[in-house]
Amino acid sequence: LISDNTKCIKCMRCIQICDKVQSLSVWDVVNTGSRTTVNVSGNRPIEKADCAICGQCITHCPVGALRERDDTDKVFAALNNPDVITVVQVAPSVRAAWGEQLGMTNEQATEKRLAATLKHMGFDYVFDTNFSADLTIMEEGTEFVEKLKRRNLNKFPMFTSCCPGWVRFVKSQYPEFVDHLSTAKSPQQMFGAVTKSYFAKKADIDPARICSISIMPCVSKKEEAALPQMADAGYGQDVDIVITTRELVRMIRAESVYPMALDEVEFDSPLGEYSGAGV
């Protein structure tokens, strides 16, 4: 999350959404007179402000004074490196929103056209995060059943751990419920681990060559992918780069890609297949 006070117009939308809707009160008015601006409340660094990194302040800022960290250069570098195999996963909500900034209708901005666009941009493998969403619900379902068998030793209800913003929120605001969270990874992180293990073996690819890229709707996914415990495959982080829907649109525009001119294609197999039950 990047803050640029030189762009701030003191509209207070970030303060209102964080305080009234998210109930976190991360942002506040600081200084007086002509020096008045918006900053982290209590003059704290953002790391100590119990921010959930939900991104609501970013989406409500009308002037770009708050924005996500731009990682598009990292993706372009991976795409232009002939020694790197780029594997991208697309979240379900991204498929529903990517066409808005490109002036496309829902009928035009189909998931198959998104897959075609990513292929046209040079991604080697284009997969659907719905695949690992299926893995997540199976893991969470199994965990829940096992807890029920020993209900006297476990705490209920069991909460999902799919969203890193939600997990951060619980840890900072309701620490007494942390033990209620599922131990299952999010679909993004499951997918990253599977990409550099099962898929790499199945496709006969050296996992060290894989750059696992994730297109997600939430900036908290960037923070999640960088956590030291999210490196189970043994080849660096399970997910190397995370970009948001807005970053994806900027990349499409930078490459002068016109999605409507592309024929629709399917997501790659086998990690592009899913039941839909995990959404």
Task: Give the role of each language-model region.
Residues 1, 21-50, 64-86:
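Non-heme iron-sulfur electron-transfer modules
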Residues 68-279:
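Iron-sulfur-associated redox domains of electron-transfer enzymes in respiratory
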Residues 6-21, 49-64, 133, 161-165, ...:
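Local cysteine-cluster metal-coordination motifs and their immediate loop/turn environment
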Residues 1-6, 43-52, 205-215:
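Immediate flanking context of iron-sulfur cluster ligation sites
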Residues 45-67, 171-175, 184:
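Helix-enriched interaction subdomains in cytosolic or periplasmic regions
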Residues 14, 21-23, 57, 62, ...:
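Short loop/turn motifs at secondary-structure junctions
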